[in-house]
Design a protein with these regions (language model features):
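Conserved, single-site charged/polar hotspot
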Residues: 1-186
């Protein structure tokens, strides 16, 4: 009688679920799922200089693109974040700046005084100088944080976002006010 109960338990616990699980996949193709092709585009970005309109000082100055990206990352994202998040921000910031350098996207209201980008976060990307960024951090952490930002930018040097062989327009908003804007208006 004990053997009978053991046999029934094995059938109930193992065999029946096996048929149920097998029947759930019965009509599915065994073809592998085809994933979209992914690629990382690394370019030798030229020109390497970007013209920046400083909204505070109302001056235009030229700087190295990678130095500009460091200052954007410092302004846009807390340095305490993980290095991979900082790298993603660096790629997005570089792509945004690069598209503006190429005049790839319309919509400039000449708020830049002839420059590629401005430092007004309400119009372009937030930007702070290295000195300003370091003054916002605790003194003993400032060098570590700046080094982390430099590493994120250096490890992604030349990498931009593309979609269907075109440089992407990586716009975003930091505050939606409870609703999002129509994409046509961005």
């Amino acid at each position: 009688r004990l053997i009978y109960y053991a046999f029934i338990m094995i059938v109930v616990v193992l065999i029946i679920p096996l048929f149920i699980v097998k029947s759930c996949t019965a009509g599915l193709d065994d073809k592998p799922v085809q994933e979209a092709p992914q690629s990382v585009v690394t370019l030798e970005l030229k020109p390497e200089e970007i013209a920046v309109y400083n909204a505070e000082s109302k001056t235009v100055h030229s700087m190295d693109l990678e130095e500009y990206v460091k200052c954007v990352v410092a302004a846009e994202m807390p340095a305490e974040f993980e290095i991979e998040a900082l790298k993603a921000q660096a790629v997005a910031a570089r792509t945004y700046a690069f598209t503006r350098m190429l005049n790839s996207y319309d919509g400039r209201d000449d708020l830049h005084q002839g420059a590629d980008v401005c430092t007004d976060p309400g119009h372009c990307q937030a930007w702070v100088s290295k000195e300003t960024a370091m003054s916002h951090w605790e003194e003993e952490k400032a060098e570590v944080y700046w080094g982390k930002i430099e590493r994120a930018v250096e490890e992604t040097r030349g990498i931009i976002i593309t979609y269907e062989d075109t440089v992407a327009n990586p716009v975003f908003h930091s505050n939606s006010g409870g609703r999002t804007e129509n994409a046509d208006n961005v």
